[in-house]
Structures are given as structure tokens and as C-alpha cells.
Amino acid sequence: MERIALFIDGANVYAAAKRLGWNFDHRKILEHFAGLGRLYNAFYYTAVPYPMDDKQKRFIDALTYMGYTVRTKPLRELTDDAGETHRRANLDIELVTDLLSTVNLYDTAVLLTGDGDFERPVEVLRSKGKRVMVASIPEMTSYELRNVADEYVDLKDIRASVERPGYRLPSELRGAETRPFYVTAPLGAEENDADEERRER
């Protein structure tokens, strides 16, 4: 059976949800892509405020409980040329490190991101005989990344499998222009799902 590794760029997925106006269920994402074979591991990358607030801690705990390996990096405040301050953290290096250091443990890498910075790492994976699937939305996926992948999945096409039902983004966020590495707040209530699952056991 084909071994699957899942790598989720949390900021990019958050930005996609803002653009689409509906939210992703992280447990369903895990189940959907694990169904492609035998899941080796699922990595989730997200920036966090320092110190973390309770909501963010619950979100991280819920992801861990679901089976994700969560990588975090503290947000830093940066000032741009216009004098505006942004909170920012980039986890590209962490994702690429896991992607390449675990290469012998999977056959297919599934990347939930549209970031063109991953074009070269994907080329390296394919040169090693690995299959790479990229999943995102077209309007947020670089041409280079989409072109180099073995397969591209439009998240809108699998909405029924990965959406969190009954949850909609606030109207002011729907279709909002996004800056992927400036946003970190979780959109779902996965921590509530984890609590409910514990109670059922």
C-alpha cells in the first residue's frame, strides 16, 4: 500500500478559507488524504503569538489529539517601508526540512499550499522517485508549483469531504484579500470536537 505524508501550510489554508468563505475541518482533511493509502504522518505548520492565548493552545492541542505533528514558530512584529507593523512568521524552512528529512518514509507527499517557494523542493522529491500532490485553490496557487507537481487538487472540488458543516466565516472576512503569513487565528472549533470525542470514549 502506498505510504502517504501530509504537509499542511496552516497560514495558506487559513487564507484559502478566507477567500472561499467556508471553513475546513482538519479531521476531515486528515481522513480524506489518509484514504489515498497508508498515512505515515501528517504535519501542520502554523505561526503562534507569544505567549500563546488559550484559544490557540486549544487549537494546537486539538490538532495533536487528531494525530497531527504540529510545528510552530512565534510571530514577530516587523515594520514595512510604509511604517506599518505586521505580525509575521514564515515556516517554509520547517516544512521543507520535514519534507526532505522523511523522504524515505513515504511514497507520496501531499502538500496543502499554493506557495511557489516550494517549487524546487518538489522537483527534488520527484527526482528521488516520489509522487507529489498539491492541494489548494487555483487563485492562490503559483503556476510554477502547480506545473511541477504530479497532481493538483482544487480544494473546491473536494469541499464535501473537507468542509466543516454549519460554519461560515464572518461576512467581513469572506473573499477578503489575504496575506498568508500575517494570519494565524484558527477558524474552526476542532478543540470542541476533540473534547466531544474524549467524552464519547
Regions found by a protein language model. Give the residues of each.
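Terminal and domain-boundary accessory regions
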Residues: 1-201
